[in-house]
Swiss-Prot record:
A quinone binds at residues 214, 263-264. Cyanobacteria usually contain more than 2 copies of the psbA gene. 2 of the reaction center chlorophylls (ChlD1 and ChlD2) are entirely coordinated by water. [CaMn4O5] cluster binds at residues 169, 188, 331-332, 341, 343. It catalyses: 2 a plastoquinone + 4 hnu + 2 H2O = 2 a plastoquinol + O2. Photosystem II (PSII) is a light-driven water:plastoquinone oxidoreductase that uses light energy to abstract electrons from H(2)O, generating O(2) and a proton gradient subsequently used for ATP formation. It consists of a core antenna complex that captures photons, and an electron transfer chain that converts photonic excitation into a charge separation. The D1/D2 (PsbA/PsbD) reaction center heterodimer binds P680, the primary electron donor of PSII as well as several subsequent electron acceptors. The chain crosses the membrane at residues 28-45, 117-132, 141-155, 196-217, 273-287. Chlorophyll a PD1 binds at residue 197. This is Photosystem II protein D1. Keywords: Calcium, Chlorophyll, Chromophore, Electron transport, Herbicide resistance, Iron, Magnesium, Manganese, Membrane, Metal-binding, Oxidoreductase, Photosynthesis, Photosystem II, Thylakoid, Transmembrane, Transmembrane helix, Transport. It is found in: Cellular thylakoid membrane. HAMAP family: PSII_PsbA_D1.
Length: 358
C-alpha cells in the first residue's frame, strides 16, 4: 500500500486563491473583484484624464467638434467626456482601430473606453456582492437591489445608443451633459408622458418618503436605556439581541395616524417593502428607457382638443408639445435635422408662381 503525504506548504496559486476568497480581509476581493478592480481603475483613470485634457470631439460627425474638458474652457458644471462621434456609429472603436491617437481622440474614443470598462466593472461589483453574501451564508437580496441602478446604467449607456444607432446618442459623462441628455430625451421621446417613467418617479419619491417615515418612526420609538442627560444612542450596543425600538408603539402610532392596515406589524415584511418598492420601480423605468431606445415613445397628444366650432381648446398637452419642439430644434442645430413633427405638415408655398430662369 502506497501512502502519499502532501507537503504542508501551499503553492503560490493556492495562496492566491485563499487570499481572494477569504472573508477575513479588511476589504473582500473575490473572483469578481479580480476583474472589477482593473476595469474600474481603467475607467476612472481615463475619465479623469479626458475630463481634464481631452481635445474637442466631433460628436455629430459634421466636422464641428464640441469641447468638454477643463483645458478647453470648461468648468466642473459644463465639463464632460463627450460621446464618440456619429461617424463611428455603433462600431467598436478601441485605440488600435484608429489611424492615430489624434484621430481616436477627435472621434471620441475615450468615451467608449470609459463606458465599456465602467459597465464591466459595475457588473463585477454586483457579482462580488453576491459572492460575499454566499461566503457569509447570507441571502442574496443585496445584489438583487443593486441590479436596479445597474439596469439604469445599461439602459442609458448601452441599450439606448444601440437602439438609436450610434454611441453619440449615449449620455455624456458630465453634469450639464446629463441634463442635455434628459432634455433631448424628452424632446425626442416624450418620456414625461411614458407610464414607466411615471412609475420610476413614484419609486424615487415614494422610496424617499418611506425611508424618512421609517427612520423617524424608529427614532421616535426607541427603548430608553440611558438617563435624561445622556444621548439615547448610548443605549444601543453593537450586536445586542434585544430590539432597540418598540415596533408595537410605532405600529400603533402610524395605524392611528392613517388607518390600521397602512402600518406593518411585521418587521421583516416592512423591510422587504422598503427595499422592493424603489428597486422594482427603477427596473420598470429602465425597461421604459430600453423601449424608447427603439422609438416606442411616451403618449403624445399631437392633435389639439377642438370645440364644436373647431377652435382649439388650450391644454397642457399643447404646452408640452411646443416645449418638445423647441428643445428638438435646438438640439444638433447645425446637423440640419429638422423635427419630423414640423416637417410632416403640409408645405407652405412662398411664391405663387415659380420665377422663370433665363
Amino acid at each position: 500500500m502506497t501512502t502519499t503525504i502532501r507537503s504542508g506548504r501551499l503553492s503560490s496559486w493556492e495562496s492566491f486563491c485563499n487570499w481572494v476568497t477569504s472573508t477575513n480581509n479588511r476589504i473582500y476581493v473575490g473572483w469578481f473583484g479580480v476583474l472589477m478592480v482593473p476595469t474600474l481603475l481603467a475607467a476612472a483613470i481615463c475619465f479623469t484624464i479626458a475630463f481634464i485634457a481631452a481635445p474637442p470631439v466631433d460628436i455629430d460627425g459634421i466636422r464641428e467638434p464640441v469641447a468638454g474638458s477643463f483645458l478647453y474652457g470648461n468648468n466642473i458644471i459644463s465639463g464632460a467626456v463627450v460621446p464618440s462621434s456619429n461617424a463611428i456609429g455603433l462600431h467598436f472603436y478601441p485605440i488600435w482601430e484608429a489611424a492615430s491617437v489624434d484621430e481616436w481622440l477627435y472621434n471620441g474614443g475615450p468615451y467608449q473606453l470609459v463606458v465599456f470598462h465602467f459597465l464591466i466593472g459595475i457588473c463585477c461589483w454586483l457579482g462580488r456582492q453576491w459572492e460575499l453574501s454566499y461566503r457569509l451564508g447570507m441571502r442574496p437580496w443585496i445584489c438583487v437591489a443593486y441590479s436596479a441602478p445597474l439596469s439604469a446604467a445599461f439602459a442609458v449607456f448601452l441599450i439606448y445608443p444601440v437602439g438609436q444607432g450610434s454611441f453619440s446618442d449615449g449620455m455624456p459623462l458630465g453634469i450639464s451633459g446629463t441634463f442635455n441628455f434628459m432634455l433631448v430625451f424628452q424632446a425626442e421621446h416624450n418620456i414625461l408622458m411614458h407610464p414607466f417613467h411615471m412609475i420610476g418617479v413614484a419609486g424615487m419619491f415614494g422610496g424617499s418618503l418611506f425611508s424618512a417615515m421609517h427612520g423617524s418612526l424608529v427614532t421616535s420609538s426607541l427603548i430608553r436605556e440611558t438617563t435624561e442627560t445622556e444621548s439615547q444612542n448610548y443605549g444601543y450596543k453593537f450586536g445586542q439581541e434585544e430590539e432597540t425600538y418598540n415596533i408595537v408603539a410605532a405600529h400603533g402610532y402610524f395605524g392611528r395616524l392613517i388607518f390600521q392596515y397602512a402600518s406593518f406589524n411585521n418587521s421583516r415584511s416592512l423591510h422587504f417593502f422598503l427595499a422592493a418598492w424603489p428597486v422594482i420601480c427603477i427596473w420598470i423605468t429602465s425597461l421604459g428607457i430600453s423601449t424608447m431606445a427603439f422609438n416606442l415613445n411616451g403618449f403624445n397628444f399631437n392633435q389639439s382638443v377642438l370645440d364644436a366650432q373647431g377652435r382649439v381648446v388650450p391644454t397642457w398637452a399643447d404646452v408640452l408639445n411646443r416645449s418638445n419642439l423647441g428643445m428638438e430644434v435646438m438640439h444638433e442645430r447645425n446637423a440640419h435635422n429638422f423635427p419630423l413633427d414640423l416637417a410632416a405638415a403640409e408645405s407652405t408655398p412662398v411664391a405663387l408662381i415659380a420665377p422663370a430662369i433665363g
